[in-house]
Structures are given as structure tokens and as C-alpha cells.
Amino acid sequence: MKNFLQQINSYIKEAFNAGKYLYNGFSVTFDHLRRRPVTVQYPYEKLIPSERYRGRIHYEFDKCIACEVCVRVCPINLPVVDWVMNKETKKKELRNYSIDFGVCIFCGNCVEYCPTNCLSMTEEYELATFDRHNLNFDNVALGRLPTNVTTDPSVKPLRELAYLPKGVMDPHEVPSSDTRVGKLPEEVYDWMRSESNEKKDKASNPNN
């Protein structure tokens, strides 16, 4: 009889734990059902990276002094700095600079410790290629400025997702005339400009 009661007690505990696990799992599922989608229809839509996004490195050849600080602070000694010593000026003369983005971990140490700020992180993340050797960028390729997602006319940024009407989850086919939760960046800019103009008018005409 005692063994039977123990089996019943164990069965009840297992059933209770199973129900608890199911509740926890479904609570996460239902919680995500109320959230907005985070996926986009790439490449027709692109997410706008944050201001501190660490994308492809931009390099300015004219500012570089070939100090090789970027090489020393890089965890994998990635940047290749090709220079020669100028005997007349007794200074380093930079010949070539390259970074292999197939190996780069985008930690940003080279950008942070560069004494002349010749390196900077961009918002470019489209580095996919069929040949890994194409990811080895020289100083010419590094010097090209990437296409800004916010000004790229060939794509539709998902910026409006944060300004959808209340209760709308799908950003597609939303009429522009619908009342939105917040103002679009262009509307905020126009409002700030109008406020600035009004202040200037009041300052120029204090009697009005």
C-alpha cells in the first residue's frame, strides 16, 4: 500500500511539473505573438543600423602615419601595413594598407586606438561574396564610402515600423494618412524647423 501511494505521489508531481513546463513554454509563445515582427524582406527592405553599429571599416589614406597601433591592438594582428623608411625625411612612408574582412571580428579596437582617426566604423554589413579573396580590401577599397541605407533609393527602410498605427502589426500596405503613434523623422524635422523659424521671427519682432 505504501509503495502504491508513493507511485501515485510521484505521478502527481510529474504531471504537475509537466503542466508547469507547458505553461512556461506557451507563455513565451503567446508573449511573442503580441510583438511586432523583427524580420524584413531583404534585400527589398533593410534595417537601419544603430549609430554605434560596427560595420565595414572605412580608411583614410592621407591621415595614416603607419604607426601600426592598429596591428598591435588587433586580437588577431589583422591589418597589413606596408611601409618603407624615407631616408631623406627619416619618416615612414606608407605604401599600402589592407584588411581581410573574412577574418576580421569587427571588435573596433583599431578604430578606438588610432591616433589620427583615419579608421572609422561604417553601417555597411553587406559583405557576402562568392570568393573569399574579395573580402581582402586594400586602401582603395577601404577608402570608398558605403551607400547609406537611409538614403538608398533602391530599398525601402523599415523605419516606419516604429511609427505604425496603434494595434497594427504588419508594416506593409499601411496608408500614409492613418494616424500613427509617433511622428516620422521627417515630420519631427519639419516641426523643429518651424519652431526655430517662429523663435527667430519673435526675436526679430519683439513688439509683435
From Swiss-Prot:
Cofactors demanded by this protein: [4Fe-4S] cluster
Cofactor remark from the record: Binds 2 [4Fe-4S] clusters per subunit.
Keywords per UniProt: 4Fe-4S, Iron, Iron-sulfur, Membrane, Metal-binding, NAD, NADP, Plastoquinone, Quinone, Repeat, Thylakoid, Translocase
4Fe-4S ferredoxin-type domain ranges (all copies): 55-84, 95-124
Cysteine pairings via disulfide bonds: none
Annotated [4Fe-4S] cluster 2 binding sites: 74, 104, 107, 110
EC number: 7.1.1.-
Protein name per its UniProtKB record: NAD(P)H-quinone oxidoreductase subunit I
Organism: Prochlorococcus marinus (strain MIT 9301)
Lineage: Bacteria, Bacillati, Cyanobacteriota, Cyanophyceae, Synechococcales
